[in-house]
Swiss-Prot record:
Gene name in the database record: LDHA
Cross-link Glycyl lysine isopeptide (Lys-Gly) (interchain with G-Cter in SUMO2) mapped to chain: 57
Protein name: L-lactate dehydrogenase A chain
Main function: Interconverts simultaneously and stereospecifically pyruvate and lactate with concomitant interconversion of NADH and NAD(+).
Catalytic residues in the record: 193
Organism from which the protein derives: Bos mutus grunniens (Wild yak)
Subcellular localization: Cytoplasm
Principal location: cytoplasm
Length: 332
């Protein structure tokens, strides 16, 4: 007896389903799900896989997204505790880890998250040996180093979300002061994602007009307009949001999909993201910090050599020393 499906549809071809543009998200907490919905809304993948250790939440999140399939253009949304669901991913986004508590510095989280990564990374490598790894979990610079060490991947394929969000926050706050959309406000925050990030005031501009040329005190203590406070707001903003709503999610999700789009579409846009910067700016250790990187289908193909002041370079070096001080104590 022919089934309804057989009566309706005549099959012409036996297909083997191998995804071409699969994205996996490890961790279905607030950040992971913000990444997931952002990716789905941008139509970046032909398959999205979700992985977590909390099976009920994982299944619930998957079903909730699947029920919206009519409104999406991603034909397959899967999930599982077993990493075999991640097979053949082009991009794996890692958001899993111990959550930052109110008032806790990102660096306090380290060893707890290293232990989690020791389980996650080998499983990803096993099922998607050619993927790009995008690390979002905090402290992101150190955990990108950890992912690089454990995976054995070349450094171009291990990327930290780094200062992409810090720079976005900076441009938003700058735009609010000037009454200009953030897309037209240009400024870069480099170095460590978080407390010791470095604003490059010399490069801040609108329509190619340097703000430092118009206002030489920009970013200094002598500045009567206190533009330095904009960077302080950037540093404090995550703590403030965590204090108010318990965690951050939407902005980091949007920031991550911005990076995912550059990778999946080979856009070769420049982003302030965390990469191995040994040999740059007098840094001699294996540390990952954010510098402007060209991002495309192979991950990070190039870095842009930014002209920094002596003071900015010293801050970057200090960040590197702080991170290395922690990294060399880590138990793998």
């Amino acid at each position: 007896m022919a089934t309804l499906k057989d009566q309706l549809i005549q099959n012409l071809l036996k297909e083997e389903h191998v995804p071409q543009n699969k994205i996996t998200i490890v961790g279905v907490g607030a950040v992971g799900m913000a990444c997931a919905i952002s990716i789905l809304m941008k139509d970046l993948a032909d398959e999205v896989a979700l992985v977590d250790v909390m099976e009920d939440k994982l299944k619930g999140e998957m079903m909730d997204l699947q029920h919206g399939s009519l409104f999406l253009r991603t034909p397959k949304i899967v999930s599982g505790k077993d990493y075999n669901v991640t097979a053949n991913s082009r991009l794996v986004i890692i958001t899993a880890g111990a959550r930052q508590q109110e008032g806790e510095s990102r660096l306090n989280l380290v060893q707890r998250n290293v232990n989690i990564f020791k389980f996650i990374i080998p499983n990803i490598v096993k099922y998607s040996p050619n993927c790009k790894l995008l690390v979002v979990s905090n402290p992101v610079d150190i955990l990108t180093y950890v992912a690089w060490k454990i995976s054995g991947f070349p450094k171009n394929r291990v990327i930290g979300s780094g200062c992409n969000l810090d720079s976005a926050r900076f441009r938003y706050l700058m735009g609010e002061r000037l009454g200009v959309h953030p897309l037209s406000c240009h400024g870069w925050i480099l170095g460590e994602h978080g407390d010791s990030s470095v604003p490059v005031w010399s490069g801040v501009n609108v329509a190619g007009v340097s703000l430092k040329n118009l206002h030489p005190e920009l970013g200094t203590d002598a500045d009567k307009e206190q533009w330095k406070a904009v960077h302080k707001q950037v540093v404090d903003s995550a703590y403030e949001v965590i204090k108010l709503k318990g965690y951050t999610s939407w902005a980091i999700g949007l920031s991550v999909v911005d990076l995912a789009e550059s990778i999946m579409k080979n856009l070769r846009r420049v982003h302030p993201i965390s990469t191995m910067i040994k040999g740059l700016y007098g840094i001699k250790e294996d540390v990952f910090l954010s510098v402007p990187c060209i991002l495309g289908q192979n991950g990070i193909s190039d870095v842009v050599k930014v002209t920094l002041t002596h003071e900015e370079e010293a801050y970057l070096k200090k960040s590197a020393d702080t991170l290395w001080g922690i990294q060399k104590e880590l138990q793998f």
